[in-house]
């Protein structure tokens, strides 16, 4: 009799546990590391003396900013990468950045040297980009400070233009723990020749 009673209770628990609809479990998302590998534009050899003895070369990267857009090309966030997180390689830089995990596509604009060399102030007007802003409008709104307001003088102009601002765009079809962005190519957005 005890065995039938125990079997009956077990069957009742079994039916009770199966009768509840399974709740849809959403994956737990948060910030995860994404490795980014950047290929720098190679300088062309020119038979003039440009920035001789200057503190920067045409390929120096002192900091980077990632502008993250969603699958609908709407701005989401800006992620800063400081100099101490950049690893220089023979042809570029590598760094790891923390981004929100997602199964959806992300469009990423990488702006190198968009801040001062020490990373304390913006050289581009990133503050004009607001969440939800369309990619085309956001990117076309970025500008450097006008040279009209820069004092005359070689060192001041050099500080204003160097290191060169460089730009790259890439897309990730989802972000998870194995996501890598390799071979991101940068273009110089300015040129500077000092005579």
Kindly label every feature range from the protein language model.
Residues 14-17:
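C-terminal motif of bacterial Sec signal peptides marking the signal peptidase cleavage site
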Residues 6-10:
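Sec-dependent N-terminal signal peptides
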Residues 19-25:
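Bacterial lipoprotein signal-peptidase II cleavage site
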Residues 27, 31-194:
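Short, low-hydrophobicity acidic/polar segments
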């Amino acid at each position: 009799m005890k065995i039938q009673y125990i079997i009956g209770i077990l069957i009742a628990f079994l039916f009770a546990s199966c009768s509840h609809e399974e709740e849809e479990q959403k994956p737990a998302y948060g910030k995860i590391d994404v490795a980014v590998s950047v290929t720098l534009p190679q300088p062309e050899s020119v038979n003039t003396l440009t920035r001789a003895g200057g503190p920067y070369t045409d390929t120096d990267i002192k900091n980077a900013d990632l502008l993250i857009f969603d699958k609908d090309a709407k701005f989401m966030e800006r992620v800063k990468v400081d100099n101490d997180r950049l690893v220089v390689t023979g042809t570029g830089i590598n760094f790891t950045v923390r981004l929100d995990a997602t199964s959806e596509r992300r469009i990423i604009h990488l702006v190198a040297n968009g801040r001062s060399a020490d990373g304390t102030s913006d050289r581009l007007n990133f503050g004009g980009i607001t969440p939800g802003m369309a990619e085309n409008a956001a990117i076309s709104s970025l500008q450097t400070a006008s040279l009209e307001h820069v004092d005359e003088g070689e060192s001041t102009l050099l500080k204003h233009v160097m290191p060169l601002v460089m730009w790259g765009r890439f897309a990730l079809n989802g972000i998870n723990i194995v996501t890598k962005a390799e071979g991101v190519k940068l273009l110089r957005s300015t040129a500077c020749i000092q005579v």
